[in-house]
Amino acid sequence: MGAAVDLLAREMSETFHDMRARLHDLTEDEFFWEPVPGSWTVFRDERGRWDHHYEEPDPEPAPFTTIAWRLTHIAMCKVMYHEHAFGPGELTWLTIETPGTPDGALDMLDAGHALLTEDLAELDDTDLERSVPTNWGEEWPAWRIFWTMTHHDAHHGGEIGALRDLYAATHRTGPDPDGG
């Protein structure tokens, strides 16, 4: 393993595990909690299948999103980036399965991360400059797939951590910390 691959692998792993630790004991109530009315989330469609709010192009301003939306977004992106950069490239946003539970989303997150970790382990430093396809048709250097997913974990993982803290602060049971 070359120095660049090793650095990407270490950073991707550390960022993922930091995010994953903040997801420990995620409840269904937290997963679906809408801190703002009209938040984008995960929901059952008219056929009873799980789906998620999504628009192209992204609306401006972007809607507020629930933990369910953010977590499934991270998980689905990992699978999609793998699928198009290193897999058969057949999966689309219309065909990928949307997980509808915390456990389902975490399972997809773990599986997607494992796929990307395996993809990176098969590369050497020169392979990182090779162009690979993305799910929206652009070509990127392979390193950018892993760099983007690391940034994605840090960005959305931080948002999820803040939402979990906000949920905990607004859903406390037991004695009032101010003594009231």
Predicted regions and their residues:
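Acidic/histidine-rich alpha-helical segments that form the ligand environment
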Residues: 97-130, 143-154
